[in-house]
């Protein structure tokens, strides 16, 4: 059973009691079969993928080993690399799918595991259930997922690599969530539908979350009727898509006439055209700088072709409040590399999937630079009176704190030139830390290697305790080590005991390197270990936030193998960090699923016994 039932694309979602709705994910459609002798993972075209995604097949063997009476069982679903509850990273999945060497596959599986999202049940206890109704199959799947103690809905921070896609009764309820998380779309399924092998059936309808972009027409192929459309990227007109679908006959005729009169015909017969004519297109996602599933909307004769920028495409790629406006996009804000406000906003949009989880439920403090990084700056933690209603906030009884959990709030703050985002160690409804952060602060940028040495010494110590730590550049001159904790697991008093223990060990074992002296003049060019900074009311620069310096450097998470003498903070800027994530993933990808409660509790227990 390899060839799967397929949904039909619809331009309007079906509404009614006879329909249920599921999130549509951008991944590899697969059949997962689990039986007593092993596991198989097969693509919809019959390609065996078990060895390509060992984190799924290996987990499947253990997840269902105590449910032998349920075997053999067969699940229909999607292999994805989750970014958030409604969206997957198809670009990373494609890279992963092309790997052939077992060692490279395992390395990628460890660094950024993919997961199988089950949305249908085809076989249970060896019995074919495809002829049961959709609702009955879904109920049976929920029972199975519950018995196996697997996530009932997609969770990018869960350790389990088999999860479930739930169904919703109401389209509007789910569509709001899909828009919020920038998901691919929704699949509507008839409640009485059977699962039909090798069929594309109108019992399943897919409704996609298309975006709109403005492009410049720069080429035309008369042989197939496709337009080449381009945008300004780094000052160069760069092709971003080929499009034919959606064009009316009269529009095609007009383009052909324009090309023949004003274009240049190449030896191959294709035409090129100097930038002049703008158009609006619809697309689904951006993959490696190219628009996917593109269709033509119409000409935009009132636009100037210089408005068709890649940054404009990125700005329109995320769901934001209709009242959000951007101003002075050409203002230079990072002087040394001449980066504009538009460049900054583009970076924040592209990094938002990795930044926002660390801002979630935190009372954020921003540092604003109204005239760019060379100008005066000021801190802001309260929501100003002039902020629009859509800007999120939290009232603690005395102050209205800014809370930044969505794109609209994030981009409003960016438009106010909030270049730095600082967060406390606890969430808005807690007085207990959600992580420990050890701040390694060398005397100057020229002394950064001291931070590298200090970080590695601390890693050896933490490893000896059985504690996993995560390094991050401060974005200025230092390194910060993160230790994740479960919510409400420890008090600040307890974490202070631990950070003080670390500080005392370091200053005693390496007196020439570390100091806890708060007065700069008394530090004698040693690295300052600020264990007092980890306290209620204190803040730390958020992962992936920019810093307000002339380069626009980023507080970038690191892999431990990168923390060596060749590490150069100046190379981690808004120009490089996005490409880095696309190629290497996020070093903090499993941060929230890896709390270090057990080893920390053991250390605190020993400290208590000694006292």
UniProtKB/Swiss-Prot annotation:
Give the binding site residues for Mn(2+) 2: 439, 441
Q: Where does Mn(2+) 1 bind?
A: 26, 184
Cofactor dependence is on: Mn(2+)
Task: Give induction info.
Answer: Transcriptionally regulated by SpoVT and sigma-G factor.
The free-text cofactor remark is: Binds 3 Mn(2+); 2 Mn(2+) for polymerase/primase activity and 1 for ligase activity.
Role description: With Ku forms a non-homologous end joining (NHEJ) DNA repair enzyme, which repairs dsDNA breaks with reduced fidelity. Probably involved in DNA repair during spore germination.
The similarity comment for this entry is:
In the N-terminal section; belongs to the LigD polymerase family.
Protein name, entry field = Bifunctional non-homologous end joining protein LigD
The species this protein belongs to is Bacillus subtilis (strain 168)
Q: What is the lineage of its organism?
A: Bacteria, Bacillati, Bacillota, Bacilli, Bacillales
């Amino acid at each position: 059973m390899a060839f799967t039932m397929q949904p039909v694309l619809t331009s309007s979602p079906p509404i009614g009691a006879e329909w249920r709705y599921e999130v549509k994910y951008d991944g590899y459609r697969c059949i997962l079969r689990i039986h007593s002798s092993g596991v198989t993972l097969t693509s919809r075209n019959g390609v065996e993928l078990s060895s390509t995604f060992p984190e799924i097949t290996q987990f499947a063997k253990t997840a269902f080993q105590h449910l032998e009476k349920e075997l053999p069982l067969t699940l229909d679903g999607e292999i994805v690399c989750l970014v958030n509850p409604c969206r997957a990273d198809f670009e990373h999945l494609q890279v992963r799918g092309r790997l052939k060497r077992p060692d490279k596959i395992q390395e990628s599986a460890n660094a950024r595991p993919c997961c199988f999202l089950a949305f249908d049940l085809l076989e249970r206890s060896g019995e074919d259930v495809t002829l049961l109704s959709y609702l009955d199959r879904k109920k049976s799947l929920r029972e199975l997922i519950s018995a196996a103690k697997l996530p009932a809905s997609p969770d990018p921070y869960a350790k389990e690599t088999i999860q479930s896609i739930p169904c919703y009764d109401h389209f509007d309820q789910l569509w709001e969530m899909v828009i919020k998380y920038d998901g691919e779309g929704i699949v509507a399924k008839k409640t009485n539908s059977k699962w039909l092998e090798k069929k594309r059936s109108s019992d399943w309808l897919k409704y996609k979350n298309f975006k709109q972009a403005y492009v410049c027409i720069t080429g035309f192929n008369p042989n197939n009727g496709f337009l080449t459309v381009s945008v300004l990227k780094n000052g160069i007109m760069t092709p971003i898509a080929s499009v034919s679908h959606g064009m009316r006959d009269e529009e095609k005729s007009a383009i052909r006439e324009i090309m023949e009169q004003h274009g240049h015909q190449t030896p191959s017969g294709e035409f090129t055209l100097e930038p002049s004519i703008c158009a609006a297109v619809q697309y689904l996602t951006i993959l490696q700088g190219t628009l996917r599933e593109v269709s033509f909307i119409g000409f935009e004769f009132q636009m100037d072709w210089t408005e068709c920028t890649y940054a404009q495409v990125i700005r329109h790629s995320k769901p934001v409040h209709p009242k959000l406006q951007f101003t002075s996009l050409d203002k230079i804000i990072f002087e040394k590399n001449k980066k504009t406000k538009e460049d900054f906003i583009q970076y924040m949009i592209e990094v938002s999937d990795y930044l926002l989880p660390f801002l979630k439920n935190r009372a954020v403090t921003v540092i604003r630079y109204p005239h760019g990084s060379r100008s005066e700056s000021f801190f802001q933690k309260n929501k100003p009176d002039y902020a629009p209603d859509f800007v999120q906030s939290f009232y603690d009884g005395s102050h209205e704190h800014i809370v930044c959990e969505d794109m609209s709030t994030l981009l409003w703050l960016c438009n106010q030139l909030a270049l730095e985002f600082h967060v406390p160690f606890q969430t808005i409804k807690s007085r207990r830390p959600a992580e420990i952060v050890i701040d390694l602060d060398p005397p100057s940028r020229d002394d950064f290697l001291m931070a590298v040495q200090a970080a590695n010494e601390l890693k050896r110590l933490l490893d000896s305790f059985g504690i996993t730590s995560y390094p991050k550049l401060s974005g200025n001159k230092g390194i910060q080590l993160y230790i994740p904790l479960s919510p409400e697991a420890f008090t600040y008093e307890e974490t202070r005991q631990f950070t003080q223990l670390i500080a005392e060990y370091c200053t005693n074992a390496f007196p020439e390197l570390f100091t806890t002296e708060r007065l700069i003049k008394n530090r004698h060019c040693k690295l300052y270990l600020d264990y007092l900074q980890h306290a209620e009311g204190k803040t730390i620069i958020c992962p992936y936030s920019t810093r307000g310096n002339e380069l626009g450097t980023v507080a970038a998470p690191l892999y431990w193998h990168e923390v060596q003498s060749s590490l150069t903070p100046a190379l981690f800027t808004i120009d490089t960090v996005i490409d880095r994530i696309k190629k290497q993933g996020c070093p903090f990808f499993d941060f929230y699923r890896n709390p270090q409660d057990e080893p920390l509790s053991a250390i605190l227990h020993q400290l208590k016994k000694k006292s």
